[in-house]
């Protein structure tokens, strides 16, 4: 059931690399918001942020496309995508380190008038 609601997740995207099972999961608060808005029935859901150009970024992009989340206003730059190294100890997640957001941590997203118009839709 779709609702006449539009949602936009703006900000972070990362992969959590679970080292003990050699598996990457996409995430980040803004990405998760956009995905769950779509799953909960938003007629339109988008993510707006900065991706790197590595395998982690391509994994997040493909995952968002699979969830029918719009990516029209994203930027993809040369560099590592945000990533965290994770394992599980006694059933709890343990974060082993990260690359501090990768390229997104080093680059500000500067909004222009076209971005602002898109956000109002």
Predicted regions and their residues:
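Positively charged, low-complexity intrinsically disordered leader regions
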Residues: 1-22
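Conserved acidic residues
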Residues: 5, 120-121
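Conserved N-terminal subdomain of the carbohydrate kinase-like
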Residues: 15-18, 43-120
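A short, glycine/small-residue-rich beta-strand->loop->alpha-helix junction that serves as a flexible
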Residues: 21-29
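Short glycine/serine/threonine-rich phosphate/pyrophosphate-binding segments
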Residues: 29-30, 81
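Histidine-anchored nucleotide/phosphate-binding helix
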Residues: 30-39
């Amino acid at each position: 059931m779709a609702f006449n609601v539009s949602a936009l997740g703006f900000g972070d995207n990362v992969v959590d690399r679970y080292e003990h099972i050699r598996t990457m999961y996409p995430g980040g608060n803004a990405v998760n918001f956009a995905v769950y808005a779509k799953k909960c029935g938003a007629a339109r859901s988008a993510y707006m942020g900065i991706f790197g150009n590595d395998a982690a970024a391509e994994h997040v992009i493909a995952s968002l496309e699979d969830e029918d989340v719009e990516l029209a206003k994203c930027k993809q730059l040369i560099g590592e995508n945000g990533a965290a190294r994770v394992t599980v100890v006694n059933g709890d997640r343990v974060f082993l380190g990260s690359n501090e957001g990768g390229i997104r941590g080093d680059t500000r997203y500067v909004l222009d008038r076209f971005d602002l118009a898109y956000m109002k839709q």
